[in-house]
Amino acid sequence: MELIEVILSKENLNRAYKKVVANKGAGGVDGVTVEELGNYIRENREKIIMSLRNRTYMPKPVRRVFIPKDNGKKRPLGIPTALDRTIQQAISQPISDIYEKIFSDYSYGFRPGRSCHDAIRQALEYLNEGYEWVVDIDIEQFFDKVNHDKLIQILREQVNDSTILNLIRKYLKAGVMENGLEKATIMGVPQGGPLSVVCSNVYLDKQDKELEYRGLRFTRYADDVLIFTKSEMAANRVMKSISNWLERKLFLKVNATKTKVVRPTRSKYLGFTFLKNGGEWKVKPTTEKKKKLKKKVSEYLKRGRAVARPLAATIKRKRSIK
C-alpha cells in the first residue's frame, strides 16, 4: 500500500483526530476551534480526502503567536488550523513509525518512550566514564533556518511517495499570518504543528549519524546537543569540525558566541547543571529550573488539586525545591 493510502486510512485519520482533540489548543487563521472540528470534518470529509489524494489541497498559513522563554525573550510559534493540525498529525504518525527504526539511540527529543531525563542520564554516563570535556553546539535559530530543499531530499531517502513529499513541501511553504499580514516562508519549520517535530528530528538525524560515524559520544534533545570527549584538545577539534560540517552539509549556522568547549560544571543542559560529588558526576536543576518548579507547585496548590493529597506530602513537595 502506498504511503498516501496509509495516511488517508480511516484508522490513521481517526487516531490523528483524537490526538488533536486531546491536545486541545487554540484555533488557527480560519477561526475553527478544536471543538468545532468534528462537525467540519463530518461535513467535508470526502472533499478533504479527495483533495489530498489528487494534490489540490492547500494548507492555510499558520497563525503567529509568541510565548515567553526562560531567558525573558519570546519564542515564535506557528499555530496551524485545527484541520491542518489533524492532517499534519496523520502524516506524522506513519512517518514517525518509519524513522523510529533508524533514528539514533542517542536522540531523545519528542520520541515515544524517551524524555529529557533520559538525555541527562546518558550525559551522566559519559561523564562518569571519564569524558569530562563538553562541546556545546548552539545552532542559531534552528527551526527558522531549516533548508526546505535539503529536508525534502533527506525525507526522500525513506519516504518513497511523491504525493506526501509534495504535501509536506506545501506545509513548509504555507506562510505565516502575523498582525493581519501574510508572510511567505522560504525556509524553516514553524514550531507549533506536529510536522515540525518530526521534520526537525529527521533533519538532525543526519548530524546524529555523522557523530556516530566518527565514534563520538553525544546526546541530543531536539536541537540541543552535547558532545563529550576526554581532552580539551579533542573537544576543540570536534567543535570546529562539526560546526563546519553543519554549515556545509545541512546549511545551518552555528552561533559562534554560544558554541563552546567547557568543563561539565560550566555547562547547562535541558535545565540542569552538572556537579561532581564524592567522585561521581550528578545533576542539579538550574536556578531558572527551580523557579519554574516552584511556580508550578504554587499553581498546583492554588488550583486546589492538593486537597486529595495528605497535607504532609504536599508540604514536603514544596519544601523539597530549594
Can you describe what each PLM-predicted range is?
Residues 1-42, 46:
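Non-catalytic, polymerase-adjacent accessory regions of viral genome-replication enzymes
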Residues 27, 31-101, 110:
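Active-site substrate-recognition loop segments, prototypically the cytochrome P450 B′-helix/B-C loop
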Residues 47, 51-66, 70, 105-266:
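Conserved polymerase palm-domain catalytic core
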